Each structure stands twice: as structure tokens, then as C-alpha cells.
Amino acid sequence: MKKWWKELIDRPLVKAFLHYYQASDSELTSVAVAYYWLISIFPLLLVVVNILPYFQIPVSNFLKVVNEFLPDTVYAVVAKIITEVLTQPSTGLLSFAVLSALWTFSKSMNFLQKAFNKAYGVAKNRGMISHQLMSLFVSFGLQILFALALFLSVFGRMLLNLIKGYWKSDSPLFDYLQDLTGPLVYALIFAILVMLYYFLPNVRVRRIRFVLPGSAFVMLTLALLLNIFSVYVNNYVNHLVDVRFFSSVVVVVMMFWFILIAKILIVGAVINASVQSLKDKRLRIN
């Protein structure tokens, strides 16, 4: 057993992975990234709240969808809030929410970039201005893609059903588009991951293929965890009948979830660094 273990850790890829993982400082960085993700939720919610009224979504249809996922006691509170949200837009609040979301998300990208740099063994960061501009650019691009993926996953099928009902059409095209919603969401998430691993680290990634292993690992791991999480929510959400208890549980679960996602993203960067180190002499470890 010891001989087998020694042979395993002496393999170049495994040896590189262990080296870069120890250098990544994932324990501390993942908590910092998760913290800024958590506080960025509130301005993002404000953005959604102030955009929805412009779509003129029928309140009754929206409430029917929400009612399917929430227990009755929670729904009574949420329904009142949703009714106000869908009828009272605020342009000033929307501008503030967008700026706040960009700031908090860019801060999380700063910490994630530091973790990626450590994973690649890069001690020197970009200059202050270029560092902030890169974080802002990546944050803005990721938020657009993430918002599109979230919109398709949450509202894609509902929007297609509304269009189908409005046109009163029985065309199989709508069923085909509904079947494409899931794969399209996964394709967008994979594009987000490739963009993240290619642009964020302060290291020259010479080939796109060097970031594909980590992106694929994160994609498959998140898909598995999301399926497990959805099963858990479907089985236990009805037991959370107290609104205050429900809110506190959601915050704790989201913080834990964000820490886990940050750790997985850092492991993805470590995998990419390990693969590239086998091909790039400048990343090769001793």
C-alpha cells in the first residue's frame, strides 16, 4: 500500500498538483471570496427587482411559479414583496445597485485572482490600476454571462410557455427550444469558467487547452453538487415554516455554498497550473 501511494504521489501530474495546491492558500482565500459573493447578492437582487417591472410580467403568473417552490408561510410574505417589486421600478436605485454589484464582485475577483496567482506560483501581481481594471473587466463580463445563464435557467421555460400561450401555437419548435435550455445554460457556464481561467491569472496561458481540464472539473463538480442540493431543497424546504428561521438558514447555507464553490474554483486553477507545468518549462517545479 505504501509503495503504491509513493508511486502515485511521484507521478509528475500528481506531484505538480500537490505542489500548486499547497501554494494556493485556498482555506483563507475561499472564505474572503465567499464573503464578497454573499454581500454582492443584495445589490444583484436590487438590480433584478428594478429591472423586472420593465418586462411587464403578469404578477399572477409569476406568483404561481413562486408558490410551487416555497412553503405557505414563507410565500405569504414573499408574495406581498413580489407584488410591490413588479409594479414599482426605481431608476436611481437601479444605478446604485449596479455600481454596488460591480464593486463587491470585483473585490471577490481580486481575492480569487490572488489565489489563482499563488496556484500558478506567481508572486508578483499586476500594477494597482491594471489589476483593478482587469478585475472590473472580468467581473463585468462574468456578471453578464452569469445573469444570462441564471435568467435562462430560472425564467427560460416560463418565458417560452408565455410566448407559446400568447401565439396559441402547437409548433414543436417550442418543445425543441425548451429541451435546449438546459444544455445552453451549461454551455454558458463552461464559457464563464474558460474566460475566468484564461484572463484572471497573472500568467500567460499560451493555449486555451491548458484551461480546459480545470474548467471541465469545475463544471462536472458543480453540476453534481447542484443536483444534490436541489434534491435536498425539494425534500426539506417545506419543513422550514418559520420565516425568521428560514432566512437565517438561507444565509448560512449560502455562505457555506459560496466557500465550497470558491474552493472548487481554486482547485480548478491548480489543475490547470499542473497541466500547464508539464508543457511549459517556466512553470515546471523542481
What are these regions (language model features)?
Residues 1-286:
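Membrane-embedded alpha-helices and immediately adjacent juxtamembrane helical segments
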